[in-house]
Design a protein with these regions (language model features):
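Bacterial N-terminal signal peptides that target proteins for export
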Residues: 1-11
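Bacterial N-terminal signal peptides
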Residues: 10-20
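Sec/Tat signal peptide C-region and signal peptidase I cleavage site
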Residues: 21-26
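Subset of outer-membrane beta-barrel
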Residues: 27-324
Length: 324
């Protein structure tokens, strides 16, 4: 494929993803600069797409050191542990995820288990996935400062928690070593907990946040640079009220070293680097804020390992779409 054709394909990819131009704002759903490494969490359709058991640990410290007026550290932190593997007897793959997301005085722990059915489309694979999730959300309302001390919504509330069930659905399509495209919905039910207080004037409750994800990427190589793999990709995350766009580009040298940059629309520029030694990959990114509010930068580190499996399948010479 010549350079002109490659560039045209990349342009089409980004136009498709960003054609629905909604104003980008901050939102509650967890965000990752290394979003290409957390496919299985955001899209159950990806489960089992690669030839092995993949385990990922990802930790993000957003706005590191940010505090409130009382000196309490309220910067968001997110830890994700996920894994997926092919499951031939079920014609697809399985995935699990455990995530803790802390934002100020709010703490969320999410556990998920999912399955993806793989359809062979002749040269490409479509994964159709569903995952059930349990979310435990807790908030220490006693630490919140209301504009009105007698705010009826906060009357009788202290440190409250509730458990909610929801599920995710996803489609993930990939052409080996060529193109991938995914669309998913997280928290389809948008579940609501029982009332947290008995206030007759106003009651408070927790809800899960229905979030839509789209992701696409196009790994390719130039004939004159066979030792380099370029991976442009883009993602959209939206809960309708707010939308976030990411666009990134990576270069991978000899399948060992990777370097890249990520732009999160109207929020940050992320610098990314990674190294792969056999089946172990370590990745790091640093986000430089562009909001102009004096917010500190964000750190993210990921560690992943692939346990190779002999699945007695017809040999296929391609790599996973995971690129650190």
């Amino acid at each position: 494929m010549d350079l002109k054709t490659k560039i045209s394909h990349i342009a089409i990819l980004f136009v498709l993803l960003f054609s629905a131009g909604i104003e980008a704002k901050a939102q509650q759903a967890p965000i990752f600069t290394n979003y290409a490494n957390s496919f299985a969490y955001a899209n159950a359709g990806f489960a089992g797409m690669s030839e092995g058991i993949n385990v990922l640990g990802l930790y993000r410290m957003q706005w590191a050191g940010f505090t409130d007026m009382d000196g309490n550290e309220i910067a968001p932190t997110t830890f994700l542990l996920s894994g997926d593997m092919p499951f031939r007897k079920l014609h697809g793959g399985m995935e699990f995820s455990i995530m803790q997301d802390k934002l100020g005085f709010e703490n969320n722990v999410n556990v998920g288990l999912g399955y993806s059915y793989h359809m062979d489309l002749g040269g490409s694979t479509l994964g159709i996935g569903v995952a059930g999730t349990l979310l435990n959300r807790s908030v220490d309302f006693s630490q919140l400062h209301a504009n009105q001390e007698s705010d009826p919504l906060l009357v009788g509330l202290g440190e409250e928690s509730a458990m909610m069930f929801d599920f995710n659905v996803g489609l993930f399509w990939q052409i080996p070593d060529s193109f991938f495209l995914g669309f998913s919905v997280v928290n389809v039910l948008e579940s609501m907990s029982e009332a947290l207080n008995d206030n007759s004037e106003s009651s408070a409750s927790f809800t899960t946040d229905r979030t839509f994800y789209a992701i696409a990427g196009y790994p390719f190589q130039f004939e004159d640079l066979p030792y380099l793999t370029f991976v442009p990709s883009a993602s959209v995350m939206s809960d309708i009220a707010s939308t976030q766009f990411n666009i990134s580009a990576r270069a991978i040298y000899n399948n060992v070293f990777s370097f890249g940059v990520n732009y999160r629309f109207q929020e940050s520029v992320g610098l990314m680097a990674g190294i792969t030694i056999k089946d172990l990959t370590v990745a790091y990114s640093y986000d430089i804020n562009t909001l102009g509010l004096g917010l500190p930068g964000s750190h993210e580190i990921g560690l992943s390992y692939c346990f190779k499996l002999d699945l007695d399948r017809t040999p296929r010479d391609y790599r996973s779409v995971r690129y650190l």
